[in-house]
Curated annotation (Swiss-Prot):
Gene label: ALX3
Sequence similarity: Belongs to the paired homeobox family.
The protein's name in its UniProt record: Homeobox protein aristaless-like 3
SMART domains: HOX
Region described as Disordered: spans on this chain: 1-104
A GO cellular component entry from the record: chromatin
Originating organism: Homo sapiens
Length: 343
């Protein structure tokens, strides 16, 4: 292998071969030169020569990527460009940007240039962040408070006098919807504005509709309560003689006891015209059956007081204490046909 074609260019003081012993060629000041690169070096020296021999080639291992912050810290002030630094200081950057923009810039301690890196942002917020909480414009809080006060403000309620209410009620009795001319005339008489009069009529119409609905509900309830009110029904307490004379003790065992009138005045089932073959208890006892019962009994069911020409009226002479009832009480177990039915 030809050593003349193995290595790229190198920088040396003078052309001259040297022994390929793995040692570095001496530099210009007698110090060892830099390690040979696999890529072409920039032309810095006056002479360019080739390495007469090549050592063992090693694979190129790229360095791991660094974050921008570390890269900027390692870079330092930066390369020179036309006699000045490429990275500007914070003061120069602020001066240039303030000329380009019309709005105020942030304080200097809030931002750092590329030379400082983002290390300033890792510390305490400092006074610069506190300045961000200041209002953008001094008049903004005042306008917000003014709008808040307007929303809280309520209009004053109009207090009408007695004369004003009388005049308004007179017109309302005539018409519920007065026209503009009537409202203006009423406003002149009552010393009010037309808008106040219009609002009063709106509220008065709403109150009137509410009362109408409530009145209809009450009218619908009154006939029902009047027709079915138990307190106004007639009571049979006005006939104590009938109850005392026809009431039998429960322990007497009389067959006619359950069929007689109860103390509450409500007839038992056997009092109906169809519960006995003789038609009624009175007919069974020999008393002529009345054509109609007492009106107090049938008034609960809505029947008319009289169904015929005669009405049942108990006598005060004690006619029901006849020998037939006495015989029934004395001989309850004897058949009815053997009893003496004398009146």
């Amino acid at each position: 292998m030809d050593p003349e074609h193995c290595a790229p260019f190198r920088v040396g003081p003078a052309p001259g071969p040297y022994v390929a012993s793995g040692d570095e060629p001496p530099g210009p000041q007698g110090t060892p030169a830099a390690a040979p690169h696999l890529h072409p070096a920039p032309p810095r020296g006056p002479r360019l020569t080739r390495f007469p021999a090549c050592g063992p080639l090693e694979p190129y291992l790229p360095e791991p990527a660094k974050p921008p912050a570390k890269y900027l810290q390692d870079l330092g002030p930066g390369p020179a460009l036309n006699g000045g630094h490429f990275y500007e200081g914070p003061a120069e950057a602020e001066e240039k940007t303030s000329k380009a923009a019309s709005f105020p810039q942030l304080p200097l301690d809030c931002r750092g240039g590329p030379r400082d890196g983002p290390s300033n942002l890792q510390g305490s917020p400092g006074p610069c962040l506190a300045s961000l909480h200041l209002p953008l414009s001094p008049g903004l809080p005042d306008s917000m408070e003014l709008a808040k006060n307007k929303s809280k403000k309520r209009r004053n309620r109009t207090t009408f006098s007695t004369f004003q209410l009388e005049e308004l009620e007179k017109v309302f009795q005539k018409t519920h919807y007065p026209d503009v001319y009537a409202r203006e005339q009423l406003a002149l008489r009552t010393d009010l504005t037309e808008a106040r009069v219009q609002v009063w009529f709106q509220n008065r119409r709403a109150k009137w509709r509410k009362r109408e609905r409530y009145g209809k509900i009450q009218e619908g309830r009154n006939p029902f309560t009047a027709a079915y009110d138990i307190s106004v029904l007639p009571r049979t307490d006005s006939h104590p003689q009938l109850q005392n004379s026809l009431w039998a003790s429960p322990g007497s065992g009389s067959p006619g006891g359950p069929c007689l009138v109860s103390p509450e005045g409500i007839p038992s089932p056997c009092m109906s015209p169809y519960s006995h073959p003789h038609g009624s208890v009175a007919g069974f006892m020999g008393v002529p059956a009345p054509s109609a019962a007492h009106p107090g009994i049938y008034s609960i069911h809505g029947f008319p007081p009289t169904l015929g020409g005669h009405s049942f009226e108990p006598s005060s002479d004690g006619d029901y204490k006849s020998p037939s009832l006495v015989s029934l009480r004395v001989k309850p177990k004897e058949p009815p046909g053997l009893l003496n039915w004398t009146t």
